[in-house]
Structure formats: C-alpha cells, structure tokens
C-alpha cells in the first residue's frame, strides 16, 4: 500500500470536515503528481501550524479537476481532487502531535533530528509526497487506534489561537482580538 502526505491548514481541515471529508484536493500545480496516485492509496492528513496527524483518507477514485468551492468559500485553489473514504477524521485536540517522542523517534523524516531543530519541517512543505512505507504503516495504525481511543492532546493557547485564527493585538485603545486569515486565504 502507498501512503501520501496530505497537508491541511486549520481552515481547510475545518472546511473539509464541514463538507463531510469525502473529497480531498490539491493545487493545479500538482495535477501531474496526482495522476500517479491510484485508487486505494492512503492519504495521511497532517495539520500544519499545529503539527498534528489528524486523519486517514483512502482514495476511491482517480484524480479529477473540479472548481466547485470546498476548501475555501470562494476562489478555492484546491481543484485537483480525489473522492475518498474518510477512515479517520480527528478533532485537532485529538490529533497526534508529531513531537510526541513515541512518534518523533519512529519516523524516518524526524528520528535523527532534535525536536527543536527546524530542519525536519522541510519534509512537510508539500502534499502528495510519498511517505516511507514503514512510516505510513506506523501512522496508519496509530491513527486507527487513536480514532478508537480518542486520547486528548490538549491544545496550547498558541495552538488554540491558530485554530480559531484569532490573535490579540494591542492598540492605543487597549487589547483587541482579531481574525487572522490563513496564508491560503489571502490573494
């Protein structure tokens, strides 16, 4: 079985879940790469900015192009899509943090790097990257187990702000909470 990285921002994860998680999408730049992914492949869903594994999607179709908005309310740039079976869909606070030692020390992309090192993140910059089979199997089984157990991994204040897309700013009139769009929501 082949395992592929599927990156989501907190916003696109939220939009996908609200639409039932039956379709996953990628940018038009990944059209050729998507054509090489076959039915029954596994997408391991990784929530960027909070660094958590949050889902398993199994492809039930070949890739196709569809411009209907799913992942953004308008101007959705994730138009190369797959129909998928949402095998595991976790809330962010149930997502598996990559920096948990039992995960970090197992994955080929991270195990030889210090947790504080920024170099590990280079592996998590683009969706559709094929994962080492051993890592894919490990995460697949771990996510299935987490889907059953639903162990909570509490979000930090920072992670909660990222997920809610809110931050506090200080102005001459005092502190104010403001919405911050994800990078993928800015034209």
Regions inferred by a protein language model and the residue ranges of each:
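Compositionally biased, charged N-terminal/linker segments
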Residues: 1-39, 47, 143-187
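C-terminal terminal-subdomain/extension
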Residues: 111, 115-155, 169-171
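Aromatic- and Lys/Arg-enriched surface recognition patch
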Residues: 59-129
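Residues that flank catalytic or metal-binding motifs in active/ligand-binding sites
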Residues: 2, 53, 80
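Short, ligand-facing micro-motifs at secondary-structure edges
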Residues: 52-60
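Short, charged beta-turn/beta-strand-edge "cap" motif at the junction between a beta-strand
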Residues: 46-52
């Amino acid at each position: 079985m082949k395992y592929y990285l599927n990156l989501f921002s907190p916003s696109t994860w939220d939009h996908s879940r609200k639409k039932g998680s039956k379709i996953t999408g990628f940018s038009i730049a990944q059209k050729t790469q998507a054509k090489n992914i076959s039915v029954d492949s596994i997408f391991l869903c990784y929530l960027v900015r909070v660094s958590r594994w949050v889902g398993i999607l199994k492809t039930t179709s070949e890739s196709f192009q569809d411009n209907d908005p799913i992942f953004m309310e308008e101007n959705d740039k994730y138009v190369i899509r797959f129909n998928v079976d949402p095998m595991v869909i976790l809330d962010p606070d149930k997502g598996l943090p990559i920096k948990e030692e039992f995960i970090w020390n197992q994955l080929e992309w991270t195990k030889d790097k210090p947790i504080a090192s920024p170099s590990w993140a280079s592996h998590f910059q683009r969706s559709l990257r094929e994962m080492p089979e051993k890592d894919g199997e490990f995460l697949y089984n771990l996510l299935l187990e987490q889907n059953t157990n639903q162990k909570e991994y509490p979000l930090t204040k920072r992670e909660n702000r990222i997920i809610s897309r809110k931050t506090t700013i200080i102005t001459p009139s005092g502190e104010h909470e403001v919405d911050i769009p994800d990078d993928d929501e800015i034209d």
